Amino acid sequence: MVSVSEIRKAQRAEGPATILAIGTANPANKVEQATYPDFYFKITNSEHKVELKEKFQRMCDKSMIKSRYMYLTEEILKENPSVCEYMAPSLDARQDMVVVEVPRLGKEAAVKAIKEWGQPKSKITHLIFCTTSGVDMPGADYQLTKLLGLRPYVKRYMMYQQGCFAGGTVLRLAKDLAENNKGARVLVVCSEVTAVTFRGPSDTHLDSLVGQALFGDGAAALIVGSDPVPEIEKPIFEMVWTAQTIAPDSEGAIDGHLREAGLTFHLLKDVPGIVSKNIDKALVEAFQPLGISDYNSIFWIAHPGGPAILD
């Protein structure tokens, strides 16, 4: 009789999870950062807030961003004036946009990743979809399955409200799925549309302005799998180790709340400080078991934020 351990071993991949393909997509509407403050304060009827606009201009100038892509055009915003106000009830209007646009943008990125992968989409065994832009049921994972024409029995995982660490979260999950399911090919999609967070400026909520200066719309897709098929699949990266941690004294540093006015967010000024105080400990936990002390000798990723966090 075959033992349980032998069955479990046969069900698992032999090698580490690898990223086999990458695809990205953005809305057609491109916004130049240098002129965005003029547009933003005009479309939100806030041009009388001269000092606040000057502050926002400085934020944009220091952002190290030259351009962004946004689903929200001038025409869309004029048709939905409640979205342009600071805290006007507008969730219905926002939801109507994102429940359609989020999976559509995700499809664009996924199609590119599948094409680069070079295998038929029928070989996709798992789907992970992650977004902070809107919540619906059935979710964006279901909508993407239909848009791509995936098999109905693809194993789906829908993740909402992960915020800035969405990318790291889906990579961690994809690695576990690929390594513990022999032959698994995981389609991973993150798609964000800032229609859910866009709002007019407020003198009392400057951290909202930081988001208006930094955030853009886009989607990214990966194919993740272990034991690449020789001469057909071409792995780009191997994922050796993933983890997640809660930094001490970080509660309230980054908050998001879904309200009638959309998704509101709050950022403390000390977020870069919290990251810098705790990054060394996280690196030691990651690399010490592997016998690595020179962090610059290998490729690793910490969650990237604005320039203050990266610095």
From Swiss-Prot:
Q: Which PROSITE patterns match?
A: CHALCONE_SYNTH (PS00441)
User: Which superkingdom, per the lineage?
Assistant: Eukaryota
Name the enzyme's class. transferase
List the active site. Answer: 164
What Enzyme Commission number(s) apply to this enzyme? 2.3.1.74
**What GO molecular function annotation could you give as one example from this UniProt entry?**
naringenin-chalcone synthase activity
Statement: the UniProt record of this protein carries the keyword Transferase: yes
Q: List the disulfide bonds.
A: none
Q: Which reaction does it catalyse?
A: (E)-4-coumaroyl-CoA + 3 malonyl-CoA + 3 H(+) = 2',4,4',6'-tetrahydroxychalcone + 3 CO2 + 4 CoA
Question: Which UniProt key words apply to this protein?
Answer: Acyltransferase, Flavonoid biosynthesis, Transferase
CDD domains the record matches: CHS_like (cd00831)
Q: Which InterPro entries match?
A: Chalcone/stilbene_synt_C, Chalcone/stilbene_synt_N, Chalcone/stilbene_synthase_AS, Polyketide_synthase_type-III, Thiolase-like
Biological process terms in GO annotation: flavonoid biosynthetic process; polyketide biosynthetic process
Q: Pathway, per Swiss-Prot/TrEMBL?
A: Secondary metabolite biosynthesis; flavonoid biosynthesis
According to its UniProt record, which protein family does this protein belong to?
Belongs to the thiolase-like superfamily. Chalcone/stilbene synthases family.
Q: Please give the function described in this protein's UniProt entry.
A: The primary product of this enzyme is 4,2',4',6'-tetrahydroxychalcone (also termed naringenin-chalcone or chalcone) which can under specific conditions spontaneously isomerize into naringenin.
Protein name, UniProt field: Chalcone synthase 4
| Organism field | Trifolium subterraneum (Subterranean clover)
